[in-house]
Amino acid sequence: MKMRARLLIPVVLWLCSVGQLPHTASAAGSEAPTALTYVTFNLFHGGAFSGLGGNAYDLDERLEIVAEELRTLQADIVGLQEASRGRERGDVAARLAARLGFHYVYAPANPRLFASDGLSRAIASLLGFEEGPAILSRFPVVAWHAYELPRCGRLIESRSLLSAMLATPWGPLRAFSAHTSGDPCQTRRVAEIVRAGQGPLPGVLMGDFNAVEESPAIAAFTRDAGLIDAYRTANPGRPGLTVWQRIEEANPTVQRRVDYILVTPGAAVEGRVASSRLVLNTPRSLRDGKTLWPSDHYGVAAEIEVSRVRAAAHVARRPETTAALPQSLVRFR
């Protein structure tokens, strides 16, 4: 009996090392698919000059609302846009990740304001403000890379795509977050990068693309690159409007759909969209009676299936890099 107990100890330790599974995970050995909950959300930083004040546009209160709803949703992976960092407000993505107990990675976009890197850094430092995309994850981030996107003729507006490799119990999973200008020359580049990084599991792009779904910018994803629009797949007849919510207005003011979760099928797992809906789309009443929305954007959530059966060849064991790189991130192209 003692010998059998000793043999079981390594098995128990390995199971503990895998960490918390998503709330939708099936039991070990089950053929039922596992769904991960993705959320994309533009946090609304308030503009470059908002860095001069820490709690601009009630940022602290809005972050509490966001953290509470993400916990309620039991989100697994969150793509943020307009994740800001400044002298007064700190690192907003880090603050939100800490509230959730998540891993995170962030890549600033705005220091590259001009062709001159020195001038760009000087202005960003003077304002005490930077912003860019971020990815928050229940699973460890073992590698990441920030891609500078083409300016498409815009002289002082820089945009970037953030890519993160996550170590999950089903194998390495790639997630992306981006905030583009609405120009198809940027979304074509994003689509090219996302498709080039195809692995056995589905890749998921989360972003504010400043473009409606009938536009050439979104067609570059869905029509040309074959990415799957999660919300539209699950809600064929709903408008799904996400932007221009006045954050202190009592009633909804959104007018356009510009926030998307897009899926590129994996080589072994298709990544079926189980469901998708708008989230972070209701206001709160503060103690002083003021109405406050989480952002000027609504969020989008999607449950995307990862089938253990089809991916069985890739999930025999947890990636070894998880233990080797708990804090040190490796950039990749």
Which functions belong to the PLM regions below?
Residues 148, 184, 195-203, 211-333:
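Metal-dependent phosphoester-hydrolase catalytic domains
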Residues 36-43, 66-89, 136, 164, ...:
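Active-site beta-strand/loop signature of hydrolases that rely on acidic residues for catalysis
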Residues 2-8, 14-102, 106-119, 126, ...:
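N-terminal, active-site-proximal structural segment of metallo-dependent hydrolase catalytic domains
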Residues 61, 65-68, 91, 95, ...:
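Extracytoplasmic/secreted proteins, especially bacterial periplasmic and envelope-associated proteins
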Residues 71-75, 97-101, 105, 141, ...:
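Sec-exported extracytoplasmic/periplasmic mature domains
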Residues 43-46, 83-87, 110-113, 141-142, ...:
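Solvent-exposed loop/turn segments at secondary-structure junctions
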Residues 83-172, 277:
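Structured beta-strand-rich core segments of catalytic domains in phosphoester-bond hydrolases
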Residues 30-33, 72, 96-98, 126-129, ...:
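Extracellular/periplasmic catalytic domains that process cell-envelope and extracellular macromolecules
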